[in-house]
Amino acid sequence: MPHFLVLNGPNLNRLGKREPAVYGSKTLTDLETDLFQFAERANIQLTFFQSNHEGDLIDALHEAEEQYDGVVFNPGAFTHYSYALRDAIASISLSVVEVHISNVHKREEFRHHSVLAPVCQGQIVGLGLEGYKLAIRYLVSEGGAVS
């Protein structure tokens, strides 16, 4: 059974409270419950981790290599400037799919650039919470390992 890490970065613990017009009204717990049910039906195992701290996310990526078949990662605002997260992703042999709930390209100019995208297998933006499921489907279809 494939096992994926769903990694959420800063402020995603505020889903449902922070800018609901942009991110929707569902909470992080709602998202995790929905993804768990989706995964159960698809015979996939998911582990969830959220942190507002860059170092914790780096540690989770490093540890993922030994435990998971791929990573779905919403790095929040770290996507725009965290070269440390970029290096962590580049250092592991797992596929990482970057996910953003909102369409970052329709928002403030500083949100238009991802320093992580070049080292990820792909990027899904603007499809709401459904983007997580699409990332999981992709990881299942390609086996999770970097080719």
UniProtKB/Swiss-Prot annotation:
Substrate binds at N74, H80, D87, I101, S102, R111. Its EC number is 4.2.1.10. Signal peptide: none annotated. Catalyzes a trans-dehydration via an enolate intermediate. GO terms for molecular function: 3-dehydroquinate dehydratase activity. This is 3-dehydroquinate dehydratase. The record marks R18 as: Transition state stabilizer. The gene is aroQ. Homododecamer. It catalyses: 3-dehydroquinate = 3-dehydroshikimate + H2O. Belongs to the type-II 3-dehydroquinase family. GO terms for biological process: amino acid biosynthetic process; aromatic amino acid family biosynthetic process; chorismate biosynthetic process; quinate catabolic process. InterPro entries: DHquinase_II (IPR001874), DHquinase_II_CS (IPR018509), DHquinase_II_sf (IPR036441). Keywords: Amino-acid biosynthesis, Aromatic amino acid biosynthesis, Lyase. PANTHER family: CATABOLIC 3-DEHYDROQUINASE. Pfam families: DHquinase_II (PF01220). Pathway: Metabolic intermediate biosynthesis; chorismate biosynthesis; chorismate from D-erythrose 4-phosphate and phosphoenolpyruvate: step 3/7. The active site is at Y23, H100.
